[in-house]
């Protein structure tokens, strides 16, 4: 893997911010003895987060921004243990929409498409992420959510979703 000096500087800036905040990830970095990286090989020294680490941070231990900056909460289902709660800032929400927009663009979609959103909405990130990305793309969005097959098919035909 090749990495530029600018990328190393950006990673080190993030490492310092996490260490200074003394949050979940800052503590993981301290425990691993990581305060900076100098090369691509140093990525091997970065600590992993395992599922139990994330569960043990319940409910808001993964928060990396001040609480007043948190605008949304998403969560895993918690079917096999405690759910993993992910706090989002406004920038996180916007970044998520931009990433979804890029996915649509990579699939060849444009603002001329009509996108029917069928994943669920709520604590899970999928439905709202698909919708935010489609809106960022400028496409027409039909926010159906899951289920109701007859209605789904009718809307696909009537709205000519792509």
Regions found by a protein language model. Name each.
Residues 1-75, 80-98, 102-106, 110-112:
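Nucleotide 5′-phosphate-binding alpha/beta core
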Residues 90-102, 114-162:
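AMP-binding/adenylate-forming
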């Amino acid at each position: 893997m090749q990495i530029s000096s600018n990328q190393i500087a950006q990673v080190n800036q993030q490492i310092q911010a996490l260490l200074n905040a003394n949050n979940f990830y800052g503590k993981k970095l301290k425990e691993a003895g990581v305060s900076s990286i100098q090369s691509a090989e140093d990525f091997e020294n970065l600590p992993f987060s395992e599922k139990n680490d994330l569960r043990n941070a319940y409910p808001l231990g993964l928060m990396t921004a001040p609480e007043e900056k948190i605008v949304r909460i998403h969560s895993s289902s918690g079917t096999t243990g405690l759910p993993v709660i992910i706090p989002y800032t406004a920038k996180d929400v916007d970044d998520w929409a931009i990433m979804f927009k890029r996915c649509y663009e990579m699939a060849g979609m444009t603002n001329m498409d009509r996108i029917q959103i069928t994943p669920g909405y709520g604590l899970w990130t999928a439905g709202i992420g698909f919708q935010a990305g489609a809106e960022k793309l400028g496409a027409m969005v039909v926010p159906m959510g899951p289920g109701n097959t007859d209605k789904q098919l009718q809307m696909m035909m009537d709205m000519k979703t792509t």
